[in-house]
């Protein structure tokens, strides 16, 4: 499971992914699964590092999901109208330049034709999660 955050702003992420309809749908679904695990509505994924990563940041994740949803539906104005809210929203501390750059590499690796703007970041097979203040790296579902 992966939530891509190539930018700290959910609006900027939605804008970057707006041409990748399949990825948008998948991200929305994965956000829903994470939010259900956080709320206790679902036991699935409750021990996954991404659930632990967003445990204290569910409001940010919900806004991220909503931005993707509205961009997918073509209602770009929804997110733009809430840009002030996005700026005030508590940003998870793990959304550093290095962390976001790694997500740019992952998106480019997955689909270079849809993410040519990330070509200069190179490629990577690693998924990064922040757990207990530490970056945890995985490749193909295995911690490295």
Question: Regions from the language model: what does each represent?
Answer:
Residues 1-144:
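Expand to "…catalyze enediolate/carbanion chemistry for C-C bond making/breaking, isomerization
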């Amino acid at each position: 499971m992966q939530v891509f955050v190539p930018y700290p702003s959910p609006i900027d992420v939605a804008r970057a992914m707006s041409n990748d309809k399949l990825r948008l749908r998948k991200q929305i679904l994965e956000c829903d699964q994470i939010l259900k695990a956080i709320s206790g509505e679902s036991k699935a994924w409750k021990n996954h590092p991404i659930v632990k990563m967003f445990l204290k940041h569910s409001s940010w994740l919900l806004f991220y999901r909503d931005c993707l949803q509205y961009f997918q539906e073509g209602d770009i104005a929804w997110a733009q109208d809430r840009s002030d809210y996005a700026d005030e929203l508590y940003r998870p501390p793990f959304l550093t330049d290095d962390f976001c750059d790694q997500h740019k590499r992952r998106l480019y690796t997955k689909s270079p034709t849809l993410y040519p703007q990330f070509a200069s970041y190179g490629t990577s097979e690693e998924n990064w999660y922040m757990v207990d203040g530490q970056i945890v790296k995985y490749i193909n579902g295995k911690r490295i």
